[in-house]
Regions:
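Acidic anion/phosphate-binding donor-loop and adjacent secondary structure
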Residues: 104-105, 142-159
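Nucleotide-activated donor-binding/catalytic signature segment of Leloir-type glycosyltransferases, i.e.
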Residues: 205-233
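Extended catalytic core of nucleotide-activated donor transferases of GT-like folds
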Residues: 42-127, 233-234
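Short hydrophobic beta-strand element within catalytic cores of glycosyltransferases
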Residues: 267-270, 286-288
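A charged, aromatic-enriched C-terminal amphipathic alpha-helix characteristic of glycosyltransferases
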Residues: 312-323, 330-359
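Conserved donor-binding/catalytic core segment of Leloir-type glycosyltransferases
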Residues: 4, 154-172, 178-181, 193-195
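Aromatic "clamp/platform" in nucleotide-sugar-dependent glycosyltransferases that forms part
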Residues: 250
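N-terminal pre-catalytic "stem/leader" segment of glycosyltransferase-like enzymes
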Residues: 1-71
């Protein structure tokens, strides 16, 4: 068995969570690897303690500089911005792209990698249409190590609980979702809304201001904003406490929180666009059709005229969204468990994902 080199970020946010799941699968296979952490980020604090896994990773890190040859392909998981740089003459890059107008810089980066893999078919088709013949599709898997049913009772009444998950940003249409939900269901004891939109790239006071702004200066007894969750165990508990997850993002590379929730048997209301389409259907989710597109620029994470992250995202009609919520309520009233959603965890696995990764190396 040959030694496989990896260039990954190991941290608590989405890129790091995916990287860690890949590494864990490789260890279970007893695959010999060497690892160079991107930006020297090596933070397993969100993961359950596992000294053996951490020791295995540290050995892989310690061996990278002495064992690696640029003649060997390296698997890298990172943004397009920063992926022209590589440790290999033939880099295999896995990246996420959520918009619709690749810049000349982004196109050039893709073309200069040996292989670029995206977890969204729409993204693959976009880059192929722009002359990138080296792109491929690979879906993510369900992280069964961190996410599982707790079988706890979280509430003493029969409320139906909605959740919105994912760091706050304009691209995810969070503001429009929350305000539409409040207009329809705010201060209704039959329903509650849990928002886990803490953005670790913003200051705590900025996150608090966002929450206050979404409430429009009013008080709603059936809405809760959660703070940062430093442990995946807490995050798993949060997902388990919900009945319906809401995902109306205008552009997604996969939609991890919504996907994990559906795999746990939670009902979902999703925008039928971008990567949601690659795993959601009308059996495992309530699908809302996009109403069109809008510019992504928000003056915070997306700035017009820059060499990266340019274009538009999908939008939705508020009435269509509320209709989707009402349909999801009916599904919950029929059964709290989304059995079709649970099937996703067997269809999309990290075992299958790593099979594909290894085949490219």
């Amino acid at each position: 068995m040959k030694t496989l080199p990896f260039n990954l970020v190991v941290n608590p946010v989405s890129f790091g969570q995916v990287s860690t799941a890949i590494l864990r699968e490789l260890k279970e296979r007893k695959q010999d690897i060497i690892l160079s952490p991107i930006a020297n980020q090596f933070d397993l604090s969100a993961q359950p303690e596992n000294p053996e896994f951490q020791e295995w990773l540290q050995e892989a890190i310690d061996g990278f500089t002495s064992k690696h040859s640029r003649k060997n392909r390296v698997f890298k998981l990172w943004h397009l911005n920063g992926s022209l740089e590589s440790f290999s003459d033939e880099q295999v890059l896995f990246s996420f792209y959520e918009l619709d107008n690749p810049t000349r810089e982004e196109i050039n980066i893709v073309k200069n990698n040996y292989k670029v893999i995206f977890s969204c078919k729409e993204t693959v088709e976009k880059f192929q249409s722009l002359g990138c013949k080296n792109v491929d599709y690979l879906p993510l898997g369900f992280d069964s190590h961190n996410f599982y049913k707790t079988n706890k009772q979280y509430f003493t009444d029969d409320r139906i609980t909605f959740t919105i998950v994912g760091k706050f940003e304009s691209r995810k249409n969070h503001e429009k979702m929350v305000k539409a939900w409040l207009k329809k269901f705010g201060n209704n004891r039959k329903y509650s809304l849990q928002c886990a939109m803490w953005n670790p790239f913003l200051k705590p006071e900025q996150n608090n201001q966002i929450a206050q702004g979404l409430m429009g200066g009013q008080n709603y007894f059936n809405v809760v904003f959660s703070g940062y969750m430093p442990k995946n165990e807490m995050y798993n508990d949060y997902l388990n406490s919900s009945d319906i997850v809401l995902g109306m993002s205008g552009g997604e590379g996969w939609g991890l929180p919504e996907f994990q929730s559906a795999c746990l048997g939670k009902h979902a209301v999703l925008l039928n666009a971008s990567a949601y389409k690659d795993w959601a259907n009308d059996k495992n989710a309530v699908l809302v059709e996009p109403s069109g597109k809008r510019d992504v620029y928000d003056g915070m994470f997306f700035h017009e005229g820059q060499p990266y992250n340019q274009g538009q995202i999908y939008d939705f009609n508020e009435d269509d969204f509320i209709s989707g919520c009402e349909e999801a309520i009916k599904r919950v009233e029929s059964s709290r468990n989304n059995s079709e959603g649970e099937k996703l965890k067997d269809k999309f696995t990290y075992s299958k994902m790593v099979d594909s990764i290894v085949s490219h190396m």
